[in-house]
Every structure is written in C-alpha cells, then in structure tokens.
Amino acid sequence: MPAPTALLRKSDEPLSAEEPSLTFSSDAQASGQGEAPSPIPTESAQHSDMRIDEESRPVFTPITDAGTVLRVETRKVPVPPHRMTPLKANWPKIYPPLVEHLKLQVRMNIKNRAVELRTSKFTTDTGALQKGEDFVKAFTLGFDVDDAIALLRLDDLYIRSFEIRDVKASLNGEHLSRAIGRIAGKDGKTKFAIENASRTRVVLQGTKVTILGRFRDLGIAQEAIVSLILGSPPGKVYGNLRKVASRMKERF
C-alpha cells in the first residue's frame, strides 16, 4: 500500500506551501495593530492642556493670538493741491506716529499727490490702517497735526463735513460771504466760542465746514453753525452754547 501513502504525502506539500501566506496575513494584522494606536498619543497630546474644575467641567487653556498680519493691506489718501505745502512742512510730525505707534509703512507720493499707507509684519492692531487713514485725511481737511493726532489716541472721535449751501441753497455772492463771516466772527471769535463750548474743532475751507469731535459734541457744534447760517443773531447762539456748556458740566 505505498501508493496511498505517497498520495497523502503529496497532498501535505501544498499545505506546507500555504503556511507562508498564513504567516504573511498574521504579519499584516500585526503591522495593522502596530499602526492603529499611533493617533492615540496625538489625541492625548491635544487634551494635555485640559484640566477639570471643581464642578467637574473641562477647562482648556486659551489659544494665544499670534498678533501678526496675515496679508499686506494698502491705503492711498489723496491730498488736495492747497494742502501739499503744509504736508511737506509738517511731514516730520506726521510720519512718526504712523510708524512708531501704529507700526505702518508710509510714504509721500509727490507725483500722484497722495500719502500711501501699508501694513507690515510688525503691525499688530487690525484697525491700525484705518486709524492712519483717518489721521492723514483729517490733516488734508485742514486740521492741525496736534488736533488730528487725537484720532489715534481716542476711539470715539468722528469727522463731519457739510457745505454751507446744503443748509441754505439760496446763498450766493455776498450773501454767501456774509454767512461765512458770521460763522468765523471777528478775528475768529465766534468759531473759537463754538469750539470751546462744544469741545470740538471746526475748520472753514471756502464753503465747506468740517467738524472734529465726539458724536454728541458734533451735533451741538453743527446746530450752532446752522443757526448762524440761517440768520440767527450771534448773541442768541452764544446764549444757547452757554446753556449747553452748563448742562455738560452738571453731567460730568
């Protein structure tokens, strides 16, 4: 009976050949088991900063802000021709607050008659570019550097501009000149009285009136100027300003 046993031995050979496939699958499972726990340390690392408070609530450490500008932004402020000479004369006073305080890059483009502002890698305030634009724009509207720089220090200051003819469209010629003179007063006394009573700054450029101050103070100054344009006596306007100033002192 050698033949049956020989057949049985031959049948055992393919089984032995299949053994490496079994070991390969077991190795694959082992390698898969070795790779599966790899993300576990990362998850634990993410929660490493977590702690539990007294009420069993998770408390995470706040994410720190990098404080860097992600992209470069630019602004261009046009300068009127009659303000180019004052801009050149006061340039040593204008650019230091923009560069040192707001960390902006600034240059005066004489050819295009504009002041160009740009953020840098040192800019940390997201509103620095807007503040710088407001500061330069206030100077181009006629305000002094010392008055315009208040826009960088205070956040509740606004600029309001309007034309004298917007108040009374029938003003022409001498009537328009007379209205401008009523706003300014003799030696600028009326304008100074409005500024001191309303805590604002007023600029007269031709037929345009520009006011710088807080929102509530802008309304007080504009109401006084509109009354003068419409023909109210200066004495009556002074009296109303005194009443408003006394009320403001009582509040504060």
Swiss-Prot record:
Instruction: Outline the segment boundaries, as ranges, of region: Disordered.
Output: 1-57
GO biological process terms held by the UniProt record: endonucleolytic cleavage in ITS1 to separate SSU-rRNA from 5.8S rRNA and LSU-rRNA from tricistronic rRNA transcript (SSU-rRNA, 5.8S rRNA, LSU-rRNA); endonucleolytic cleavage to generate mature 5'-end of SSU-rRNA from (SSU-rRNA, 5.8S rRNA, LSU-rRNA); proteasome assembly; ribosomal small subunit export from nucleus; ribosome assembly
* Polar residues bias: start-end ranges: 22-32
- Assigned GO CC terms: cytoplasm; nucleolus; nucleus
- Broad class of where this protein is predominantly found: cytoplasm
Q: Which SUPFAM superfamilies match?
A: Eukaryotic type KH-domain (KH-domain type I)
The listed locations are:
Cytoplasm; Nucleus, Nucleolus
Report biased composition (Basic and acidic residues) as residue ranges.
46-57
Membership in a protein family:
Belongs to the PNO1 family.
The protein in question is named: Pre-rRNA-processing protein pno1
